Amino acid sequence: MEEFQGYLELYRSQQHDFLYPLIFREYIYALAHDRGLNRSVLLDNVGYDKKSSLLIIKRLISRMYQQNHFIISVNDSNQNKFFGYNKNLYSQMISEGFAVIVEIPFSLRLVSSLEETETVKSYNLRSIHSIFPFFEDKFPHLNYASDVLIPYPIHLEILVQTLRYCVKDPSSLHLLRLFLHEYYNWNTLITPKKSIFAKSNQRLFLLLYNSYVCEYESILLFLRNQSNHLRLTSSGILFERIRFYEKIKYPVEEVFANDFPATLWFFKDPFIQYVRYQGKSILASKDTPLLMNKWKYYLVHFWQCHFYVWSQPGRIHINQLSKHSFDFLGYLSSIRPNISVVRSQLLENSFLMDNAMKKLDTLFPIIPMIGSLAKVKFCNTSGHPISKSSWADSSDSDIIDRFVRIGGNLSHYYSGSSKKKSLYRIKYILRLSCVKTLARKHKSTVRTFLKRLGPKLLDEFFTEEEQIFSLLFPRTSSTLKRFYRGRIWYLDILCINDLVNHE
């Protein structure tokens, strides 16, 4: 960060806050190669690590100085127009470098805001599991929840326009448009499964998408909090969680006060809560369903009028928390009453009182998980374990390590489940699938293979947490029983592991 700040101060004095000249500097691509300001396991530079070198970077910069290479022939789409060769490599290098450059002002703004508010930076807030304690604290007191799918922009120009409030350099925005027009089909780039979370050029498009979501959430927070410039601590924490730093000091109230003079009281609700992860959000309230419907249709019109994004009211579902569960971050969560009986003694008379309290119930999604295991050939659609034939050529230790890793990840992530019986069933499927895979490799039966290895094979599937607790407490102790029954939220989980990645 100190190195970045030094470079930026130098160019501020020379270029009047222009970021465009930084793209011609070698250290920018070196920082992009090293994942720049914020290292993250979510952003893997596939192919870029193996092909990047100082010679290629120097060649790239020298070719960018030759302006005739930027001439675009729209009619001839089959030619390699930018540099003549190594188009994919150069485009990925430019996108990574540009993403690092645009992140500089956001990172510096975050540091300055933390210094002004004297906020201690908590890395625990980055964990996905940190959302569930918030659910446990707030949602039992709420009545209705809206399941909102944030629509993707139809055109990438919308994403570029959201950066104009933060990036005051027109040359950088023009370069971004040139890059997107040159290398991508704007109509198909933002499909959620193939592009915006793709491994190639992921950092740049996460930056664009986060700027779009940040713009949407900043206006939503303004209407919710009716505050100036969104300088609340809660908004700062929200932007820290999405890795997109603090919103620029932009007079939001001057823009929207004239457009919504009678709307602020219309949506005033002190009990409304908002949670989001990627493109899915939950909007919960203690008020009546009428207010939730007003929020629903307001969001639809807001997306259509402000972002020119088509959305339908059917994409937003309003459910009563006491009667319906909501799917969020892989858990099926619901609010159920927890009735406790209290015996009261008054002089010679005694009577029983039922004390009903609402409690958040987080369930393990057994049916979708079996479908995921069946998709990657660990079991059939009925949940019956089968051998993993594609792993039969690997060594025994490699096969066991793969199964143990998947089982450990599932146990670690779903440790907050209220009822772990379904989780144990999934672990049983993985154990038996591992045994069948090893038996198939050695051309033996499952029974014979288990007799030869004994119980040591199954001990490999105990998670690290279970091993530690089993050493500290006896198997019959009440503490260990509470460990197996209770919910545990870990603050070191930054992403959801996909089973397909273990193919």
UniProtKB/Swiss-Prot annotation:
Its main location: plastid. Pfam families: Intron_maturas2, MatK_N. It comes from the Eukaryota. Keywords: Chloroplast, mRNA processing, Plastid, RNA-binding, tRNA processing. The keyword Chloroplast applies. One of its GO terms (biological process) is tRNA processing. HAMAP family: MatK. Usually encoded in the trnK tRNA gene intron. Probably assists in splicing its own and other chloroplast group II introns. This is Maturase K. It comes from Rosa canina. The lineage of its organism: Eukaryota, Viridiplantae, Streptophyta, Embryophyta, Tracheophyta.
